Curated annotation (Swiss-Prot):
Any one GO biological process: D-xylose metabolic process
Pfam families: ROK
GO MF annotations, alphabetized: DNA binding
Name of the featured protein: Xylose repressor
Originating gene: xylR
Length: 383
C-alpha cells in the first residue's frame, strides 16, 4: 500500500465527514468537528495532496453574501475494492470504487465444492495489475461465507464447501498483496443495513438471512455483535420439535425444515417434480394448493422465529434477506400480521433488506473499506 494511504487521526475524522456527507464544505466540517477553519484547511490540503479527496465546485453563499463555500467529495478514482460472496453454487464478485460506487460485477459457477477450486477461480479472474482507471488500483478484498469466522479471521465452519485445510485470507493476501477481510454473510448484510443513511438513527437491528441456511446479523448499539467465537446469530441451529413424514416427533434444526432451500425441497418431494426457483413462484401465483400450503407453513414458522428473536434482543428493526420473500412480498405482509398478534410490547420495524441481491456484497465493501482506512461507521447511500 502506498504511503499516502496512511492518514492520522484528525485526517480520519475529516475523511469520515466527507464519506458520510456528500458534497460537504470545509466550514460545515469545521462546525461538525469543532475544529477551527485553519486546522481543517491544513488537513484538507494534506488529504488533497494524497489524492483522497477532490474539490467539486461551489455551494450556495449565505444570506449575508460573501464567498461561496468550496464543496468536497471522496476521490472515487483513488482505487477500488473487490468483495466476494461464496454462495452454495457460485462465486459472486463486486468491484467498487474508493467511494463504494459499484464498478462492475461478475459471477462464476462452481463445478465442485473444494476451496482449492474457488481459489483457482479467483486467481484466474482477478487481474491484480488492472487499475480500472484509478490511481492505485486494488486496495483490498472482502470475503463473505455462509459459515462461522472467529475473531482471528479463521474459518471455524464452512458447511457447504470442502475447506481442505486451505486459508482464503493467507492465500489471497499472498496473491494480491492487499489487505483481506473474511466475515459471515449475515453479519455483512447487517453492516450494510446499519451503514445506510436512512438507518442512521437506528442503534439496534437484526438482519435475518434465509437461503440454504438461516443466519442473523446482530447490531447492538451500532456495533456488530459476534459473540465469544464468532458464532452469534447461528439461529438456524435452533432446535424445534417436528414430525416429518408422519414419524414420531424429533428435534430438527430449524434451517433443515424451513430455510428457503428446505421449503423448495419439501415442495418438490410433495409434487414429485424438481421445480426451479422461477417455477416455484409461478406455481404459487397460479394457486397450486400444495405450494400454497407449504408456504403457509413457512410463514408460520418464520413468524415464530422472528418473534423469538425480538423477545431475545428487542431490536429497533429486523430486516429479512430472502429471495423468496423478495419475489413474493405478500409473504412479508402475512408474517407482519401474525407477528403483531404474538408481540405485546412496543412495535418494531419489520422490513425486507434494502437490497436483497447486493446487501452482502455491499456489506463486504464496507468492511474492507473500514479495515483499510481504520475508520468505523462509514455511511453509504447505495441502495
Amino acid at each position: 500500500m502506498e504511503n499516502n494511504f496512511i492518514v492520522n487521526e484528525n485526517e480520519k475524522r475529516v475523511l469520515k465527514q466527507i464519506f458520510n456527507n456528500s458534497n460537504i464544505s470545509r466550514t460545515q466540517i469545521s462546525k461538525n468537528l469543532e475544529l477551527n477553519k485553519a486546522t481543517i484547511s491544513n488537513i484538507l490540503n494534506n488529504l488533497k495532496h494524497k489524492s483522497l479527496v477532490n474539490e467539486v465546485g461551489e455551494g450556495n453563499s449565505t444570506k449575508s453574501g460573501g464567498r461561496k463555500p468550496i464543496l468536497l467529495e471522496i476521490n472515487q478514482k483513488y482505487g477500488y475494492y473487490i468483495s466476494m460472496d461464496l454462495t452454495y453454487d457460485s462465486v459472486e464478485l463486486m468491484y467498487n470504487y474508493f467511494d463504494a460506487t459499484i464498478l462492475k460485477q461478475d459471477s462464476y459457477e462452481l463445478n465442485d465444492k473444494n476451496v482449492s477450486s474457488i481459489l483457482q477461480i479467483l486467481k484466474s479472474n482477478i487481474n491484480v495489475s488492472e487499475k480500472y482507471d484509478t490511481l492505485y488500483g486494488l486496495l483490498g478484498i472482502s470475503i463473505s461465507i455462509h459459515g462461522i469466522v472467529d475473531d482471528e479471521q479463521n474459518i471455524i465452519n464452512l458447511p457447504f464447501h470442502k475447506n481442505e485445510k486451505r486459508t482464503f485470507t493467507d492465500e489471497l493476501k499472498s496473491f494480491t498483496n492487499v489487505p483481506v477481510v473474511i466475515e459471515n454473510e449475515a453479519n455483512l448484510s447487517a453492516l450494510y443495513e446499519k451503514s445506510l443513511y436512512i438507518n442512521s438513527n437506528i442503534n439496534n437491528l437484526i438482519t435475518l438471512s434465509i437461503h440454504k441456511g438461516i443466519g442473523a446479523g446482530i447490531i447492538i448499539n451500532k456495533k456488530l455483535y459476534r459473540g465469544s467465537n464468532g458464532e452469534a446469530g447461528e439461529i438456524g441451529k435452533t432446535l424445534v420439535l417436528e414430525s416429518i413424514n408422519n414419524n414420531d416427533n424429533k428435534y430438527y434444526k430449524i434451517e433443515d425444515i424451513c430455510s428457503q432451500d428446505a421449503l423448495i425441497q419439501k415442495i418438490n418431494n410433495r409434487l414429485g417434480v424438481t421445480l426451479t426457483f422461477t417455477e416455484l413462484i409461478q406455481y404459487y401465483n397460479e394457486g397450486n394448493s400444495i405450494v400454497a400450503h407449504e408456504i403457509k407453513q413457512f410463514i408460520n414458522k418464520m413468524t415464530v422465529l422472528i418473534h423469538n428473536l425480538n423477545t431475545q434482543f428487542n431490536p429497533d428493526a429486523i430486516y429479512i434477506n430472502c429471495p423468496l420473500i423478495n419475489e413474493l412480498p405478500n409473504i412479508l405482509n402475512e408474517i407482519k400480521e401474525q407477528f403483531s398478534c404474538f408481540s405485546q410490547g412496543s412495535p418494531i420495524q419489520l422490513h425486507l433488506t434494502t437490497n436483497v441481491k447486493q446487501a452482502t456484497l455491499l456489506g463486504g465493501t464496507l468492511a474492507i473499506m473500514q479495515k483499510t482506512l481504520n475508520i468505523n461507521n462509514i455511511q453509504m447511500n447505495i441502495k
